[in-house]
From Swiss-Prot:
This is Nuclear pore complex protein Nup153. Changing F718A: Reduces affinity for RAN. There is a cross-link at K354 (Glycyl lysine isopeptide (Lys-Gly) (interchain with G-Cter in SUMO2)). Belongs to the NUP153 family. The lineage of its organism: Eukaryota, Metazoa, Chordata, Craniata, Vertebrata. Its cofactor is Zn(2+). GO terms for biological process: amyloid fibril formation; mRNA transport; negative regulation of RNA export from nucleus; nuclear pore complex assembly; protein import into nucleus; RNA export from nucleus. The gene is Nup153. The modification Phosphothreonine is found at T97, T103, T370, T389. Residues 1-39, 78-128, 172-222, 387-429, 693-714, 960-985, 1121-1145, 1190-1209, 1231-1260, 1308-1380, 1414-1468 are annotated as: Disordered. Transmembrane segments: none annotated.
Amino acid sequence: MASGAGGIGGGGGGGKIRTRRCHQGPVKPYQQGRPQHQGILSRVTESVKNIVPGWLQRYFNKSENACSCSVNADEVPRWPENREDEREIYVDENTNTDDGRTTPEPTGSNTEEPSTTSTASNYPDVLTRPSLHRSHLNFSVLESPALHCQPSTSSAFPIGSSGFSLVKEIKDSTSQHDDDNISTTSGFSSRASEKDIAVSKNTSLPPLWSPEAERSHSLSQHTAISSKKPAFNLSAFGTLSTSLGNSSILKTSQLGDSPFYPGKTTYGGAAAAVRQNKVRSTPYQAPVRRQMKAKQLNAQSYGVTSSTARRILQSLEKMSSPLADAKRIPSAVSSPLNSPLDRSGIDSTVFQAKKEKVDSQYPPVQRLMTPKPVSIATNRTVYFKPSLTPSGDLRKTNQRIDKKNSTVDEKNISRQNREQESGFSYPNFSIPAANGLSSGVGGGGGKMRRERTTHFVASKPSEEEEVEVPLLPQISLPISSSSLPTFNFSSPAISAASSSSVSPSQPLSNKVQMTSLGSTGNPVFTFSSPIVKSTQADVLPPASIGFTFSVPLAKTELSGPNSSSETVLSSSVTAQDNTVVNSSSSKKRSAPCEDPFTPAKILREGSVLDILKTPGFMSPKVDSPALQPTTTSSIVYTRPAISTFSSSGVEFGESLKAGSSWQCDTCLLQNKVTDNKCIACQAAKLPLKETAKQTGIGTPSKSDKPASTSGTGFGDKFKPAIGTWDCDTCLVQNKPEAVKCVACETPKPGTGVKRALPLTVASESPVTASSSTTVTTGTLGFGDKFKRPVGSWECPVCCVSNKAEDSRCVSCTSEKPGLVSASSSNSVPVSLPSGGCLGLDKFKKPEGSWDCEVCLVQNKADSTKCIACESAKPGTKSEFKGFGTSSSLNPAPSAFKFGIPSSSSGLSQTFTSTGNFKFGDQGGFKLGTSSDSGSTNTMNTNFKFPKPTGDFKFGVLPDSKPEEIKNDSKNDNFQFGPSSGLSNPASSAPFQFGVSTLGQQEKKEELPQSSSAGFSFGAGVANPSSAAIDTTVTSENKSGFNFGTIDTKSVSVTPFTYKTTEAKKEDASATKGGFTFGKVDSAALSSPSMFVLGRTEEKQQEPVTSTSLVFGKKADNEEPKCQPVFSFGNSEQTKDESSSKPTFSFSVAKPSVKESDQLAKATFAFGNQTNTTTDQGAAKPAFSFLNSSSSSSSTPATSSSASIFGSSTSSSSPPVAAFVFGQASNPVSSSAFGNSAESSTSQPLLFPQDGKPATTSSTASAAPPFVFGTGASSNSTVSSGFTFGATTTSSSSGSFFVFGTGHSAPSASPAFGANQTPTFGQSQGASQPNPPSFGSISSSTALFSAGSQPVPPPTFGTVSSSSQPPVFGQQPSQSAFGSGTANASSVFQFGSSTTNFNFTNNNPSGVFTFGASPSTPAAAAQPSGSGGFSFSQSPASFTVGSNGKNMFSSSGTSVSGRKIKTAVRRKK
């Protein structure tokens, strides 16, 4: 069947591209006959691959593969292996491609098709249709081995009906599931995709699709045929063998794959794919996007990665990367056999061809990615496949190129190789199917690859061979020859006078032969090859001082001795012109010479060093010999042998001292002769005589000829000139005329100038160098230079070698051994200066100076303290300030105290507007315990770590000072240690991580409106008595962050204590925000905001809003108006005042709100929290994660939000929203996640189990607890609790959101526990407003039911507002997302605040609270100056439940204001 289908594919005009795609299929050597088996359908299918979704293609491939398997029995057994391998590759791909859409179904689906059964089993993914069809379009069709077999399957199925149905299904799946695939991150995330999969499989998707695809493609192919344009079917070129199918799998990625999606980028699902078929039907339509996708052949399974992530990864992999591009570079070395393995990276098995094809299946980049030997030939690199399957196109193109590039022999070789490897004949592109199996099927390249590989192997080697011997043009070194002197360490024997003065134009022949070395008897070492010496002194113009350019000798005139100049030629440099003449480089420019080296036209005589010494060497004039011939020098100075190092025998140093340059005496820089001043230091040039003297070289004369220098050794060149003297101080060699060392200006020895050290006038060098530079030092060896001078002595102290004339060691000034007197016969006695030898005395310790015993710093004699550490001078009585305890009654000294400051003195410090950041007493920064005796420093802006009234304390803070609270002082303290600062009851909110007992005594008169926020991590007992003993802070916002225990009994102290903090604050109406992680006992009257992680007991006796964030146990006896307590420990809040106190406690929190003030008390307790809000006007939302008994007895309109994570007992009648994760007993509408019994309006959010029944039913305050545990909210006020535990809400309009069993009596609070509010568990709402609950709801309010309640506000929490909020059912007048009584105050508070941002803004105060916060106008007004951004209590709250209204029910309870109605709701 497959064979039957073959023709169409070949015929398709667009088939070319498709054919290339088909080529991608892996090529198997034994599959040569395979293409014959490929049917027209197969070809069509392969052509259609572009159009058909990858997953469908997989079906086809499987079918074809199955068919092919059946067709070729021999291949069938291999099929499993191949398929296995391919499947691994393919499955990985599919897994990536499928984006997790692949389902177990594939196996079953595979079985659906008998032919594809084996294939399916092998390729379960193939059958699986990924929801993202695009991604799979490419992969599946090409990838599935059945792809090639598919034609038969396709033929079996009518193209029309099945194709259409399949198409439709694909459209649905593709459009939907492509989207799904895009949108969803998991495999078959969309039902449609699964459905489609099932449908497609059941429908025999491969057949259907192949026919459908065949229709469009056959048309296109036929069109191509009709147009007689060469069309190529991948199948035509490749066999339908499974290996080909496998390669097709890989090819699929190449099919018009989007860099971002595994499949074709046709957007619009299957419909788009169909359109693509038509569009692609155009034979030569080149897909616009030919992306080089670097996709791994073996796509690793992406475990849990979502389909989207996988798509992204796949797209990235497919992207062309530098590495992939580099890999694309063909490696001619590797053989075609190796290439497939290398390329595909698949197991090196018999199926290398297949693997290769698989490799090719990937986008060209990917194929290229795998380092493929010759097979990836430049063709691949060069050609980009216009077709959707880039690889196939590339391969075809490559084949063409190969054909073009390769000779017939190469073709034959390549064919043989290919045939051996893949068993394919070299296909003609014009012939669609002639080439046979693998080349076409193999991803458009099995065969082609082989071909290319072979091709390249054949062709490239020759090319490489040609390239092997590149003809490199001689490029002169950019470096001037002068900079690259040649060092000849064997001195050639040079005959002097051999250099006849030849016109400079005559080049010196390069034939210069190395004359016998050592003929002159000179040492073997030669610095530069001897330049031909012009022994004629006449040649030397008088102007050339010490430097002569030898006239270049005509090569005819070159004598043997001159031949030595050859050596010189390379190093010869045009010194004057700074032109380096390289004989080799100049040979071309010089007159033709048979010699290998053409001599420079102008030869400069002299050593390289001479030239190096010349300023030209340092100047850019120096040109490389190649760049500038020596002709540049207009004047040729023939310097006698002076410039010839070894041959001339001139000293090495003298050559440097050539007359062409002069050395600056000051900076020793070589300057040009023409320079009158040193170019560096601008020192004037010395007269010629002086120069000669300094250089030790006279103007070169005939006598300068190195006749006598032949015996000098190499070392002689380095010997100092006669008269030079070495500075004893810096050892710099100075010229004879210098009276001072040029470096250190030390007087020359014997000049009569006083020197620190006696210096010898004698020169080190025994050699006397005459100005003629002729060194007479015979044959001194090089090592002689390093021999110790006669008479030199070694200092026994420092082992420094000293000269014989030195009476003292030049280093340590030690006396010369055996010398009694400091002076010697040849040394000048010198009186050392007071500074000691060399001024070393300066380093001596001044007389009387003393070293600090502490820091070892040397101090002056008159210093009584160390200048560094101020330590007292030894023997002097100095006051040492240690880190011990310092008790300073005056806070003026700023001490940083880490200890427990026991400030027991009546420190009535009125830090009225002191913007002090104090960690302890103002006095100082003390590390130890400090007792602060009250000093009143108003406006004292010091950075003090001792305790101020608002303390951040990490230790136990016993604040037992009565403090005079001045309402204008604002004390923010940050204490790390316990600070016994009596913080005013005014706003004392400790942030305590320990147990925090906030027993704010009701000294309201003293703390009118001071809000203290304490953050204590220890148990803090804040009992600020109104007496301003310690710190008088009145109406000051005091935020304390206490990590220890805090006993704050003075002005509102916000301790941050890590230890137990006892903050007793007597100020009422002060906002106390305490965040305590320990036990915090805060009795401050000011509204404390306690965040207690431990047990929190809050007893607020005043309507102060106390916001406590308590992480420890916190006993708040006083609850300011705004007291949010966030307690992570046991939190006991006794709210005596109508202050809303939000408590967030992670421990047991017992907020006892005793005061029926208008306090919104939000308790957020993570531990057991007892919120007893006696204030009736305080709405207390408790958010407790542990047992939370929130009983707010105060029924005023104060919204006490107790957010308790511990047990929160909020009994405040004001709206208290308790968010209880444990059991929350929230009589108030409390949101308790635990059992929250909130009798007050406080809304505790209790996460732990809180079995504390609501103490007292609060009045019309709406406290919606959010209870996740059992929540019993018996609050008459609207209590909207979100409780996950059982919540008994007996609040009037408390709506609980209870996940557990909740009894919500009056308040309709959504409770996740049992709660009157809408609960997800059983909820018994005793209060008339029954919040919709997800559990059983015993509430008069209909939950989710269309009842007729007068006012159902659309509230997510309970809304106690006189207005009827619009509900999802009936909306009377109030439209709020939470139950909110909009008071006049407009505050966007998440805690309690008079002004609330309510969506149901009926009361003046509108609060947007996430806890239940029925905003009672009075309650809203009550919060003391708390216009804060509170997350807890608030009169108006955004509550999940509605005040006695069913949020989700059409029936609305017309609850106006505090009107409590029992919603009739279903009860479970």
